[in-house]
Amino acid sequence: MVAPPQLRALLFAINALLSKRRYHAALAMLKGFRNGAVYGAKIRAPHALVMTFLFRSGSLREKLRAILQATYTHSWNLARFVFLYKGLCALQSHVQGKTYQAHSFVSAFIGGLLVFGNNNNINSQISMYLLSRVLFALCRLGVEKGFIPEPRLDPFPWFSGLVWGLVLWLFEYHRPTLQPSLQSSMTYLYEDSNVWHDLSDFFIYNKSQPSK
């Protein structure tokens, strides 16, 4: 099917605009917004689907609404953050005439305050997800730069043992300090497995099904 001349002219004009170097920073912000929205939806929707149907009570409509709300919030926040981060980086580079490493930190710091500063479940999950990876990366950077002696043996087994020891101790004795979705997951694993009445809720279901 051949596109009408008006559509071909429009596409030609858009592609010509996209190829102009002078608009690259602004266009990169727009594409960053697009990619943030898509990526946020792709990673949040499956997670929200599983967590909602595993742990949330309520009608099907309420569950679907919760899934859509969580997906929208994650997607919208990530899109705004990428847009703001790229814009602030471009602005600093333009003002100072070149790019410095500090630009990334300053831009992301401001974006984090403005976009992810609201203390809710989704922002909390995202920040904690990043925290674990930041700590790992900083340890590796410390070894790379010589600030931390390179270990002779792989420290990962000790790290894993420490993490699991701490999280189960917190769950058993200081549960309110843990993030709600982690509490739900650990309750399913370590508390619900202590209770059963017959084969149905021992093997087939987690909890007894209400009689109709």
Swiss-Prot record:
Q: Which family does it belong to?
A: Belongs to the peroxisomal membrane protein PXMP2/4 family.
Q: Does the keyword Transmembrane helix apply?
A: yes
The protein's name in its UniProt record: Peroxisomal membrane protein 4
Assembly and interaction partners? Interacts with PEX19.
Segments crossing the lipid bilayer:
97-117, 153-173
**A Pfam entry, by short name:** Tim17
Provide the protein's localization: Peroxisome membrane
Q: What is its main location?
A: membrane
Give me the Gene Ontology terms describing cellular component. peroxisomal membrane
Could you confirm whether the keyword Cytoplasm appears in this record? no
Q: How does it sit in the membrane?
A: Multi-pass membrane protein
* Residues annotated as glycosylated: 206
**Superkingdom field:** Eukaryota
Q: Which InterPro entries match?
A: Pmp4
Keywords from UniProt, A to Z, are: Glycoprotein, Membrane, Peroxisome, Transmembrane, Transmembrane helix
